[in-house]
Each structure stands twice: as structure tokens, then as C-alpha cells.
Curated annotation (Swiss-Prot):
Record protein name field: Cyclin-D5-1
GO cellular component: nucleus
Keyword Cell cycle included in the entry's annotation: yes
Keyword Ubl conjugation in record: no
Length: 323
């Protein structure tokens, strides 16, 4: 692995802004309402098999870079908190976190002590892009909650969006577990009607977002993660949660493209997920700093750093004026 690129320089983007020319200060309501991804049905066998084939062809396990786990947790926590604030769909937050992970694997950022603002800026830009891909009502860039220590102007967020788009080669339509949820649920719940379908889908979505704090988008194929979260969400009793390889194979045995390789990958991810859940129950959750509203103005209020593209290459500690 090479030397880390200058994290500040990474956020200087020279792309044209013409493709992101919306009014950044206003909420946009799109006429092409986006539908949730878990609309796949049991009749879509060929469609799902094609998705799996694409995943298998494109999948590449990428090594972890040096971005600290605490920095990543803070970023994910902000994305999840902001999702709730705006009422975004679960898949919008998941896609934002996926953009975040993919970007960091392609452009490793070695943060210095006073450069944690770069992770927050990346979080804002990733969620904004995901909202533009998934949501019908898209907030303006100035409406995203800001940290009390610094403020990002819309132009800076838009330039970071362009950097993300360029880094990901403009491939923003990701295959996610949401494409598979209905399909797997139909396959594994044929003999279990004790848990409602809507409840299982909600459990799967909640479990998936919680799992993003432990597992990166780049570690597993998305159908593997979908199969595991659906298995756990559809369990009606604690005895259902400890499945063997053979029991998992039986759950998915009716799927034409399911092989021993798929079964092994799902089993290993399943075991890891159970270990994560057990560890959570044994260990108190760490305190993660989350974004709060700026304090009221007054003599005791902390001054906020303001970021715009005119002084973006300057050290954050020197940018004390609000422009």
C-alpha cells in the first residue's frame, strides 16, 4: 500500500459543476417518485440470478485502509441520525454508507489531528448523492445539519459530490441487499407464517443499517448480506437463530442458482453476524460523538469554522471567519 494522499488535496475537485446545477438552497421535489428496492417477487428468478452473476463478476475484496474505525463510526452515526431527521428510506442511508466505504477504499485518506472535518464533509456529500438517487423530496445542500465546529457551504459540498462521482467512475446505481429482501423472504418463509412479511422487511432493514457499523460494503456480496439479515429477521424464536450449514442449505435449497459456494459464504457471514450480536450484548455501546445543533449565540458560544472553496486548502484552524 502506497503513501497516503494528502487528505486536504483530495477535496479539491476540478470537474465541471454543470451536471449538479440544481438550486442548492431549496428542497427539490421530483416527479419520478422512487420505489423501494424490495419490490422483487418470487417470480423474478431470472432477474435475481442475473444480479448475483453481476455481483460475482464484479466483486473484489478490498483490504482495509487506515481510516480509523472511530472516524468511520462517527460518520455512519451522522448519516443514520440525519436519515431519521429527514425521513429518508433505509436504502438511502445504506447507499450513502456504501459510497463512503467505496470512496475510502479507492482514495485512502490519512487524517491529521485537525482534519476530521474531511470525514464529515464526505459524509454530507455521500448522503446528499444518495438522496438524489433514491428520494422523491431532496433537501437543499444548505439544509443538511452542520457541526457546531464548522459549516460547509453548498459550493464546497457540491465539489465534494463531484469528487465522489469521479472517484466511483459515476457508477452510482449500486446493487444492494434491498434488491433481494422480498425474494429471499419468499424462499425461506414458505413454512413459517408466524412473523408478518412487513415486520420481517422492517427488521431486515433495521438490522442491515446496524450491521454497517461492523461490516463494510466491500467485504461481502450484497446477496450474502441480504440472505443473512433476512434469516435473522424472519426468526420467530431464539432456537431459529443457531443454524448449521445444512440447515441454511435447506432454507435456500429451492433456489436454482444456489451452490455450496453460496451456502458457505452465507454461513460464514451468518456466524460473524451472530458473533457481532453476542459481543454487543456483552459490551456496553461506546459513546460516539454525534452532530448537535449549534449553541445559542452569545458570549459563551463557540465560534464556528466556515468552509468555502476560496480557502479550502488552508488549515482548518486558521479559517475562523464566517463568509
Amino acid at each position: 500500500m502506497g503513501e497516503p494522499k494528502d487528505s486536504l488535496a483530495l477535496f479539491l475537485c476540478h470537474e465541471s459543476e454543470s451536471s449538479l446545477n440544481e438550486d442548492d438552497d431549496e428542497t427539490i421535489e421530483r416527479s419520478d417518485k422512487q420505489e423501494p428496492h424490495f419490490t422483487t417477487t418470487i417470480d423474478d428468478e431470472d432477474y435475481v440470478a442475473d444480479l448475483v452473476l453481476k455481483e460475482n463478476l464484479r466483486f473484489e475484496t478490498l483490504p482495509s485502509k487506515t481510516t480509523s474505525s472511530s472516524d468511520r463510526l462517527i460518520a455512519i452515526d451522522w448519516i443514520l441520525t440525519t436519515r431519521t431527521r429527514f425521513g429518508f428510506q433505509h436504502q438511502t442511508a445504506y447507499i450513502a454508507i456504501s459510497y463512503f466505504d467505496l470512496f475510502l477504499h479507492k482514495r485512502f485518506i490519512g487524517l491529521q489531528k485537525d482534519e476530521t472535518w474531511a470525514m464529515r464533509l464526505l459524509s454530507v456529500a455521500c448522503l446528499s448523492l444518495a438522496a438524489k438517487m433514491e428520494e422523491r423530496i431532496v433537501p437543499g445542500l444548505s439544509q443538511y445539519p452542520q457541526d457546531h465546529d464548522f459549516v460547509f457551504k453548498p459550493d464546497v459540498i457540491r465539489k465534494t459530490e463531484l469528487l465522489i462521482l469521479s472517484t466511483l467512475d459515476w457508477k452510482m446505481n449500486l446493487i444492494t441487499p434491498f434488491h433481494y429482501f422480498n425474494y429471499f423472504l419468499a424462499k425461506i418463509s414458505q413454512d413459517n407464517h408466524s412473523v408478518s412479511k412487513d415486520l420481517v422487511l422492517l427488521r431486515s432493514s433495521d438490522s442491515l443499517l446496524a450491521l454497517t457499523k461492523e461490516i463494510s460494503f466491500t467485504e461481502y456480496r450484497q446477496f450474502v448480506v441480504a440472505a443473512v439479515t433476512t434469516l435473522l429477521a424472519s426468526s420467530s424464536t431464539s432456537s431459529d437463530i443457531r443454524l448449521t450449514r445444512e440447515e441454511i442449505a435447506n432454507k435456500f435449497g429451492s433456489i436454482s442458482w444456489w451452490t455450496s459456494n453460496e451456502n458457505e459464504n452465507v454461513y460464514l457471514c451468518y456466524q460473524r453476524t451472530l458473533e457481532i450480536e453476542e459481543r454487543k450484548h456483552m459490551t456496553p455501546p461506546p459513546e460516539i460523538a454525534v452532530s448537535r445543533e449549534p449553541p445559542a449565540s452569545g458570549s459563551g458560544a463557540k465560534r464556528r469554522l466556515s468552509f468555502d472553496d476560496s480557502d479550502q486548502s488552508s488549515p482548518p484552524a486558521k479559517r475562523m471567519r464566517r463568509l
